[in-house]
Each structure stands twice: as structure tokens, then as C-alpha cells.
A protein has these predicted regions:
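P-loop NTP-binding catalytic core
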Residues: 58-62, 66-133
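N-terminal accessory targeting/assembly segments
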Residues: 1-84
Length: 144
């Protein structure tokens, strides 16, 4: 069972990992298919029986704290952020208004991306900017 990650989802109780798997990066929930856990190396394992469409809908409602309209801006971007920095990508039919996505309907899948620390990922950047006595740096860029 996924309990150490403290995902605020009742559906997490259905997810089981039968073999050791460290560094889980994603949990993919898809209607009519088993959920899949993916670790930071890209290894995938089936970790539940298939989720029904109603279980996916219930999970989505729970992710939105049963107030989907409160998360409309995030949903329009295709994801919802959970406490702890975890993000849930939404797969469904986009509803557009004036060429802009407003929301999703017929949600068929959720991709839970587990927030995790990557130690040392900025060591080179840090030494490059701060070795000469620079005291502040602003780094801006388009999200990947």
C-alpha cells in the first residue's frame, strides 16, 4: 500500500506494490486498466486491479476536495497540485471556450507525479554563480 507518501486519497489504499520499488515518481490511474507505478529510473510495475470510471471520477473529486469549481484555473492547465507539492495530471476531454481550455469532462485517467528531492542537481549552477562573491541570482525560464 502507498502510505509512506501520505497521498491524501482514499484510492491510495487500492494501490499495492508487490515487489520492492524505490523512488516512485508517478502513479498512473486509468479507467478500465490497472494502475502503474513508475520509479525515477523509468521502471514500471502494475500496482492495482483496474480502476473503474466511477473510481477515477471519485478520485478526481477527492483531489479537488469535492469542490471542482475551486480548482478551475489549475484544471484548465491540465493538473491539480496537492499538499506536499505532488501534482495530478488530468486526462479527459477538454472543454474549450473561445479557443481556451476551461475544464475537462469525461476524465479517464489521472497521473499522480510524486514530488521528490534531487540532491545535488544545482551544485554546478550554485558554484558557477556564487563562487565569485555574487550574492543573488534570479533564474527565470519556461517550464519544461
Amino acid at each position: 500500500m502507498i502510505s509512506t507518501m501520505k497521498l491524501p486519497l482514499k484510492s491510495a489504499a487500492k494501490i499495492r506494490i508487490t515487489e520492492p520499488m524505490s523512488g516512485i515518481a508517478e502513479i498512473r490511474l486509468r479507467a478500465g486498466r490497472p494502475s502503474v507505478c513508475v520509479n525515477i529510473l523509468g521502471d514500471m510495475r502494475i500496482c492495482s486491479d483496474p480502476f473503474s470510471a466511477s473510481e477515477i471520477a471519485d478520485c478526481f473529486a477527492e483531489i479537488c476536495r469535492y469542490s471542482v469549481h475551486s480548482f478551475q484555473e489549475e484544471i484548465a492547465q491540465g493538473f491539480v497540485t496537492l499538499d506536499g507539492g505532488h501534482r495530478v495530471g488530468i486526462c479527459g476531454t477538454a472543454v474549450k471556450n473561445g479557443g481556451k481550455i476551461e475544464m475537462f469532462k469525461d476524465i479517464s485517467g489521472l497521473n499522480i507525479r510524486i514530488a521528490h528531492e534531487i540532491k545535488g542537481c544545482a551544485d554546478e549552477v550554485y558554484s558557477r554563480f556564487f563562487s565569485g562573491g555574487t550574492r543573488s541570482v534570479l533564474i527565470a525560464g519556461k517550464p519544461l
